[in-house]
Amino acid sequence: MARYTGPAWKLSRRLGISLSGTGKELEKRPYAPGPHGPNQRKKLSEYGLQLQEKQKLRHMYGMTERQFRRTFDQAGKMPGKHGENFMILLEARLDNLVYRMGLARTRRAARQLVNHGHIMVDGARVDIPSYRVKPNQTISVREKSNSLVVVKEAIEVNNFVPEYLTFDADKLEATYTRHAERAELPAEINEALIVEFYSR
């Protein structure tokens, strides 16, 4: 399944979750798009709830189904809870951590920064958004890219960097000090439903 490239706001309303991270999509119209307005939502079956939760998380991180499932399977081989490990692996993606650093206003924009070669890991350029960052690795912006307007604008409006990243705004550099804990990850996701979906 290809990565979704359509209107993010419409998809956010359909899934009932802010994919931009701003929450603006749901402020005026907190219901799915369509001619029937707020009265069109139907009660979902158990399978429907599981599928919806899977789609929420997949689109939140901007992944194809193949990438998403592969990461899910990798999480199942780790000790501990399958669902929590899955969330932690998703959070360790390079494009996501660029977003968490505040270098981009959305994960989609962060993925473009990585794709276009603006991001480095431990001093080496990495242009693979799905690259899994390991604890104690350093993420930075290439010196030639320090003056990018999109990065400057994103930094200006960002007011939160998670505790598992130590960020130096002057150097545009962060160290991924440790893996995230489940309590630090999106509370609106019920990963147990995703485990159930793939276990069917």
Swiss-Prot record:
Matching Gene3D superfamilies: Ribosomal Protein S4 Delta 41, Chain A, domain 1 (1.10.1050.10), RNA-binding S4 domain (3.10.290.10)
Pfam families: Ribosomal_S4, S4
Coiled coil: none
GO biological processes: ribosomal small subunit biogenesis; translation
Alphabetized InterPro entries for the sequence: Ribosomal_uS4, Ribosomal_uS4_bac-type, Ribosomal_uS4_CS, Ribosomal_uS4_N, S4_RNA-bd, S4_RNA-bd_sf
UniProt domain S4 RNA-binding: residue ranges: 92-152
Record key words, sorted: Ribonucleoprotein, Ribosomal protein, RNA-binding, rRNA-binding
Single GO molecular function: rRNA binding
Region (Disordered): 22-42
Family note: Belongs to the universal ribosomal protein uS4 family.
The protein's role, per its UniProt record: One of the primary rRNA binding proteins, it binds directly to 16S rRNA where it nucleates assembly of the body of the 30S subunit.
Subunit (UniProt): Part of the 30S ribosomal subunit. Contacts protein S5. The interaction surface between S4 and S5 is involved in control of translational fidelity.
NCBIfam families per record: PRK05327.1, rpsD_bact
Protein name: Small ribosomal subunit protein uS4
Gene: rpsD
